[in-house]
Swiss-Prot record:
PANTHER family: CELL DIVISION PROTEIN WHIA-RELATED. Gene3D superfamilies: Homing endonucleases. This is Probable cell division protein WhiA. Keywords: Cell cycle, Cell division, DNA-binding. The keyword Repeat does not apply.
Amino acid sequence: MALSADVKAELNRVLVTRHDVMTAEVASLLRYTAALHLVGKKIVVESEVDSAETARRLTDMVEQLYKIEPEHQIIGAGNLRRRPRHVLRWTEGGMELARRTELIDRVGRPVRGLPRFIIGGTKDQCVAAWRGAFLAHGYITDPGRSSALEVQTPSNEAALALVGAARRIDVTAKTKEARGVNRVVIRDGDSIGRLLMLMGAQDTREVWEKQRRTRENRAKANRLANFDDANLRRSARAAVAAAARVERALEILDNDVPQHLAHAGQLRVEHKEASLEELGRLAEPPMTKDAVAGRIRRLLSMADKRAEELGLPDTHSAVTSELFNDVD
């Protein structure tokens, strides 16, 4: 989770000056972290975040936009919490904050998705909504086979709204539900990199992209190595099998075999794991690999025909599983 902390630290340093963008980020942060309480007929907005920096950012933005200050409570780390949590509580002005950020509708009912001013807003507001959502409950995994950027959401409607905001900024995201928890997931590497850049985590994006390229290059090298190794094993098995068949062919034909075919066959028997090209260089005089292959094919064909005439096991009978013990 080191990358997640780096992303959040960088996002908390992003300077926002436009009020519409700031409002979108605040509304999103509250949507994905806040709970609404009714205390003495007054709505209290309570938001729980995982860092002092995020708590300070949210406090400053709300104060700048709405002139409302929260109570700040720190909950220490415990058995179920690795880090302290920061609870911001707006008791005075909670109703106004909930209405202005559309946590509730005009008649006071809770809204489950994102505010309409984000859904129908600008691309900058969609980016701000994603920044707020990531600061609220986002994390990113190290690049690899299962790399992902995820945001936990309080409802399916909130997840679908975030997917829609991602689509507006050309980022591919999907919803996912596991054990009753709704999430928005981005798995495409290019989309993850684009979103990090848009949100303002450029430095972390460069680190993530570098790790991604390293993993991809390593995986490609491993695939090539495995491919080459498999090819070598197949070639070695074929050469050993051919040598066993040639040896059986020479037994069947005995001395009744043309000298040039016998010479090629003897080379195959003496150099069991050599390639055809290597056998051609060892021949006297040297031959091409096609010439060696042709002579060995004719030798085996002659021997199989002779074995059929005499009722003997043919050259294929010499190829047994024990031959490949040393090769595999």
